[in-house]
Curated annotation (Swiss-Prot):
GO terms for cellular component: extracellular region; nucleus. Residues 1-46, 93-115, 174-235 are annotated as: Disordered. It comes from the Eukaryota. The keyword Phosphoprotein does not apply. Belongs to the krueppel C2H2-type zinc-finger protein family. InterPro entries: Zinc_finger_trans_reg, Znf_C2H2_sf, Znf_C2H2_type. This is Zinc finger protein 653. Interacts with NR5A1. One of its GO terms (molecular function) is AF-2 domain binding. Residues 106-115 have a biased composition (Basic residues). A zinc finger (C2H2-type) spans 467-492, 498-522, 528-550, 556-578, 586-609. Keywords: DNA-binding, Metal-binding, Nucleus, Repeat, Repressor, Transcription, Transcription regulation, Zinc, Zinc-finger. Transcriptional repressor. May repress NR5A1, PPARG, NR1H3, NR4A2, ESR1 and NR3C1 transcriptional activity.
Amino acid sequence: MAERAPEPGAEAEAGAGGEAAAEEGAAGRKARGRPRLTESDRARRRLESRKKYDVRRVYLGEAHGPWVDLRRRSGWSDAKLAAYLISLERGQRSGRHGKPWEQVPKKPKRKKRRRRNVNCLKNVVIWYEDHKHRCPYEPHLAELDPTFGLYTTAVWQCEAGHRYFQDLHSPLKPLSDSEPDSDKVGSGLVAGSSDSSSSGSSSDSEEPPETQPAKASAAAAALTPASPTGSSGLITQEGVHIPFDVHHVESLAEQGTPLCQNPAGSGPEALETVVCVPVPMQVGTGPGTLFENMPQEALGEVVASCPVSGMVPGSQVIIIAGPGYDALTAEGIRLNVAAGGGTPSSSLGEEVPCAMMEGVAAYTQTEPEGTQHSTMDTTSIASIETKKEKEDLYMLKEEKEDSVAPELAELAATVPENAEAEAEVDGEELDSSEMSAIIYEIPKEPEKRRRSKRSRVMDADGLLEMFHCPYEGCSQVYVALSSFQNHVNLVHRKGKTKVCPHPGCGKKFYLSNHLRRHMIIHSGVREFTCETCGKSFKRKNHLEVHRRTHTGETPLQCEICGYQCRQRASLNWHMKKHTAEVQYNFTCDRCGKRFEKLDSVKFHTLKSHPDHKPT
């Protein structure tokens, strides 16, 4: 009897019923995530992916070893290293000479230090006041660098390394060619030209330490204070301005010591008088006063120049402040500064600009180079007088509080602006009255000091000390002591104490933040989305690995055979082919698949058999 073929309607109903049953069974098995693809679909996608990325895969052959070594030394990925080599090749094509592998990117040129406000006493006070709030150490003159012929750079530095560069120019402008003789003035405290200031200073390595303070004083005497207000006087450590009028300035030293010379043929416009004036009193009381820590014998003999008849306007007074004034008066030095006129110095007018030198060490009397006894003018030596009276030494007029207050307010208002502007702005144009530069340089220390390379320890040979784990069976090696201590405490002593509370998971971790990161898997929240295809992920590193499927980047590569992959797990699985036989001691109860670790079995069961209840 012939078999009757099934009717098409019944076959369609049976097919529909089977699909519905399959959907119900799939819905019953589905616990989380997207449904799994069939084996045929997975194989088809795998084949398409291989065809897609085989085109981009590059086999290095014999050059694989040098490539891996170059990548390890540079710390770059394969894509970045290849892009760098391609850029070098393009540069060679565009006209640069040399081989691509010999070309090194040029280092950016260091920006030259620009000179700003020359010899500006206001900036010195600003830097000193700001440095006093930042650092407990007192700055001193550390170096005089006569690198250029036009100016000498004075470096003020404290014990903490904070530096302040000051370019000391000659107070006078360069003279005309019709007066060549007036260009050469003695290199003492009389600064007649830029040649005198630069020739009078030498490097620190060519002179003994005893003469360095004297050299420093001679070079610092070439300052021309560019006070914004044009007033003369003393600016104290607290920023108080004390003006005074100069009537007559007389200085004396030991008999027979040459102090200055008045070259023949030089007119009054070729000379500038610089006088050292000691301050007879400390400004302020209590701790923090001017030079409170300086001993009485700190100031010895003072090198001073004599006032010359026909002194030109613009001459300056260098004030050497310190409590050793009594020692100076005991040596017979008399300096009379008062109001009035009638002396040769009265041609200066009512005001004479002055500069201040703080923290002055013991000064020794030295003879300037190139100064001859035979060429000294007897009239200049005759103007030096020796007297013992202390009453007529030095007169200071204290300014009233109402007149001091606006200057203090102005100085306080300009401190933060100048400090930040000089540290950041380099392209500002200078006023015509300011000849050159004072550079404000205080390195700002970080508020919270970072760990010095994570507590790395150097041995006697200057090499990094390696810390090997002392526990048996553990081959971990660390270069940072903190990392080594964390490994011993967490892995070998404390262990994995943080357990996942999710039912059926039970995974353990060393730290709470690791457990917190793991709990995102169970939450189902996918906050990391691919911009190209819109696929979402639970972790950021999963998204980064997925992006490589769009870019074709395979940054990981086997050092033995050259196999390239996108993620670390694939490389770890691949490396098992090159190692000894791995023991798969753990088997899945549902499908019989074997694993190396028990945690792998648990993860496989949760993902592949979600309907199975673990015992």
